[in-house]
Amino acid sequence: MDFAAPPAVVDALQQRIAHGVFGYGHPWPTLTASVLAHLESEYGWAIEPEWIVWLPGLVTGLNVTCRAVDGEVLTATPVYPPFLSAPRFSGRGLNRADLACCDGHWQWDKIALQNASTAATRLFLLCHPHNPVGRCWNEDELRDLAAFAEQNNLIVCSDEIHCGLVLDADKRHIPFASLSPDAARRSITLMAPSKTYNIPGLGCAFAVIPDAVLRRSFLRAMDGIVPHVNVLGLAACEAAYRDCGDWHRELIAYLVGNRDRLAVAVNGEKGARMSHVEATYLAWIDVRELGLANPAAHFEAHGLGLSDGADFGAPGWLRLNFGCTRATLEEALGRFAVGCRAV
């Protein structure tokens, strides 16, 4: 996002910098307590301290997971590009099932998911909330996925980095691992304060792995390739989860305003349609009716840098980041309109 980090995070960083010693960091008790308290207060999810494995980034966690779990990998497209590259980097086969889009509403295609799973599939990569389609998966959908994982004996790696960015007031984030003891046993949950509090450059994330055997496999896969977590990232994480509630509420209200303004503008252009964004600050825009060979290049030529849907497994779509000031958004919308009308 284009917003400054919360003042409490900046204060925590300044205090840590004033300390003056920047050796390797090791998580401290009050940091762990802030994570545990945050997960329980926000999501009703009570975890044990030993379940936490600290990471320098969430994408690192995706790649470690693919190394830690033997067998083929299953995911659903469109999806955040590292979901598609991590299995390849780990020498794992990747099976894809397309999500279904009905009247602009994205949902799971249970038949496609089952057909894409093979006897060799052992890992399911779940994006929750979903990047880029903006869904906050509800309890029924998650329980269906948990049943699917149990029936097919799958480990579920749930990327929940956008869990603090649910925009719809009637929606709430439900951690996959909180559904049941079986869901917890077969889960690796990846989280970070980076998206919600705009601190991705500080390099701090974590995995929550309740099962001891699975956790040991994950730790073994990290050996020798995953560095220590940035000590400044750890300090920022503690402050973000402990001291930034008011800032977070203001952020959500502002993002809702951006989303609603964006939806009106995009859906008002001929040949463009935007899916409703329940969570994240990312809009998923269908421009297939414009008939462009390369939509991202077309809009870039009109001064608007958008993520190419082809990278997510969905050519003809574009992703727009609306985590910005209203003035920047209005400028972007003007350029989007020019691009649409230039076809």
Functional labels for PLM-detected ranges:
Residues 238, 247, 253-263, 273-286:
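Conserved glycine-rich beta-strand-loop-beta hairpin in the small C-terminal domain of fold type I
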Residues 101-170:
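Active-site phosphate-binding strand-loop segment of PLP-dependent enzymes
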Residues 90, 151-152, 183, 269, ...:
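Helix C-cap/helix->beta junction micro-motif
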Residues 67-87:
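Conserved PLP-anchoring active-site segment centered on the Schiff-base-forming lysine
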